[in-house]
Amino acid sequence: MNAAAFDTHKFQVGRSDPRLAECLKEFPAATFNERLYQSMELMERYSIELAVDLLGQLNLAEQLGAWRSADELCSVLDFQPRFRLALQWILARLVESGCLQMRDDGATRSYRLRNTPWNPDLKYLRALGLNIDPANAATLDLLDYAASAYPAVATSRQNGDHNLFGPQGISLWLNYFHNDNLTYAINNWVGAAAAVDRLSSRPMLRVLEIGAGAGSATEILLMLLSERGLLSRLGRYVVTEPNAYFRRCNQRKLATQFLNLPLEWSAVDLDLPWSEQGIGSGEFDLVYAVNVMHISKNLLFSLNEARSALAADGWLVIGECVRPYDNQPIYPELMFQILDSFTDVETDPEFRPNPGFLTGEQWRRAFLKAGFTRTEVAPDIERIREIYPHFFTGAICGQNTAIAK
C-alpha cells in the first residue's frame, strides 16, 4: 500500500457488502447496521492515524533508515521491555499504511522506512466519526487518551494501568463499555444472542457471569432473556466483578433496572481457584463472560475452572474481540496493550501464541484443550473475514459434554 493512498482528507466509507448482513441475519437487529459498519471503518483508519502520530512522538522514524526489529528499537531508544508489544502494533499499522516495509526471517520481524509519513489530521477524522454517530466519542476519547500515555509508558517505569485507570481514565472506560457505544456494544449483543440460543430449551436457568464490569453485558443478556420470555425460568444469576467500584456501579444500575430477579453480586478472580471464592462445582447452566477470558493469566486454568462450575451439558459462552487473521493489528488493541493485565499472561504456541486477542481457530483449540469437546463459534467469523476483515466480534461456545449423562 502506498502511503499516498492514505491521504486523510480523501478517506471515505462506502456501504458494507450485502453478504455481511446475510452472515448476521440470525442475530438481533441491534447487532449490526450501516452506521456501525461506518464507525468500525472510521476507528480502523483513526488508529492508523494515531500510529503515524506516535511514529513522530516516539522518534521512531529517525531510527528506521536501516532494518530494525521491535527489540532493537526498544534498546536503541531506551524503551521499557514491556512496551515491545505496543511498539510491534504501531509498526504493523505503519506497514499497512505504506510508511514502513517489513521482512520476516521466520524468527524476527524487522522494519524499515519506506515512504515519508503524512501529517496526521486526527481532528478531521474525529469530526467524521462524530458525524457518523455522536456516540463514537466514547471510543475516540479512549483511543486518544490511551495514545497520549504511550510516550510515558515507553520511557518510564510507570505502567499503563496507572495511566489509564486514574480518575480521568475511569470515566472514559465507563463511557466506552456503555451500550450506547455501538462499537463496543456489538460484543455484548453477539455474546448474549449466542448464550440465549443455547439456554432456550432449559426449564431452569442458573447463570454465572465472570468479569461483568459495570454491567453492560449483563444488561443485554437480561434484555434478550426477557424478549425471549425466559426470565421466569431464571433461578439464579451470580454477577461477579473483582473491581469494587465497577461492581458497585453494576449493582446500583441492574438492581434498579431489573426488579425482583434473583441477582447476586460477588468478586471472583478468574486466575485463582473458583471453588475457594464461593463458586461450587456443577452449579450453573451457563458460565458467561464478555471480553474477559483473554486476560486470564493461565487460559487453560480459567477455562477448566469454568467447565468445573458447569452442570452436565451446561455451556460456557464468551463474547470476545476476535482477531480475524494471525498477526493482524486491530484498533481495539491500542487501548489495551499497554495494560499489564492484558500483556502479562502465559502464552502457548498451539492456542495462545500472543497476549491479547486471539483468532477463532486459536479459541477453538483452547476450548478443546480444556475439555470442551463440543465447541462452536458464532457468527461464522471465518466466512465473514473473507467478506469484511474488520469484523472483530465472536462468541466462542463450549458445552460440558464430558460429564453429560
Language-model-detected regions and their locations in the chain:
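N-terminal accessory segments
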Residues: 1-182, 188-206, 371-377, 381-384, ...
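Local beta-strand N-terminus motif with an aromatic residue
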Residues: 204, 234, 283-285
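A short glycine-rich, Lys/Arg-flanked "PGG" loop and its adjoining helix->strand segment in the class I
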Residues: 300-315
